[in-house]
Amino acid sequence: MCNLGVDFHDTISFAPDFFKEIFRTWGTKRYIVTGTPESRRGETIKQLEDMGITADLYDELLMGYEYNKSEMTIDHFHRMKVHKLQIIKDYNISIYFDDNPFYVEYLRNHNIIVFQTILNDKYLTEFENKNNFFTCNLQRGQFKYLADGESGQNNES
């Protein structure tokens, strides 16, 4: 039994039609996992519906803990990765999609098949200009090692 978990922001919201089709055809439980606080459940459901992700396509929306955006320091990401792992374990999710390299790195060694949604530069630029707390900009440096390797900067001396 392979229950599916998919992050909302910058995963489903990046490719809603793709995930709509996966949800529609998935044979077991389908969960949307978000770090968004429970107090914003109604707003989150509305955003999902606006993308065509209706309640009949998933089994449950699993929310994050309460926090203020001003608390989004590195400590927040450490707590959220543990929170997401607990949700994934509690709901027996064995396949999980998330865009955030911080979470992907943590989850990949916990007996979960993890897929990372890779965001294109256009999307990254559009959303980092809209929201100072936009976290998928963590992907900006993710491929720097490859670019540095092509330019010879990764060569060991």
Which residue stretches match the model-derived regions?
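Acidic, Mg2+-coordinating phosphoryl-transfer loop and its flanking beta/alpha structural elements
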Residues: 91-133
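Non-catalytic pre-domain segments flanking phosphatase-related domains
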Residues: 1-5, 138-139, 143-157
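Alpha-helical substrate-recognition element adjacent to the catalytic core
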Residues: 1-74, 78
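Residue-level preference for short coil/turn positions at secondary-structure junctions
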Residues: 26-27, 89-92
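Short loop-to-alpha-helix "cap/lid" segments that border enzyme active sites
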Residues: 48, 77-90
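Conserved glycosyltransferase catalytic-site signature
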Residues: 9, 81, 85, 93, ...
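Active-site regions of enzymes building and remodeling cell-envelope glycoconjugates
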Residues: 27-34, 44-53, 110-115, 128-143
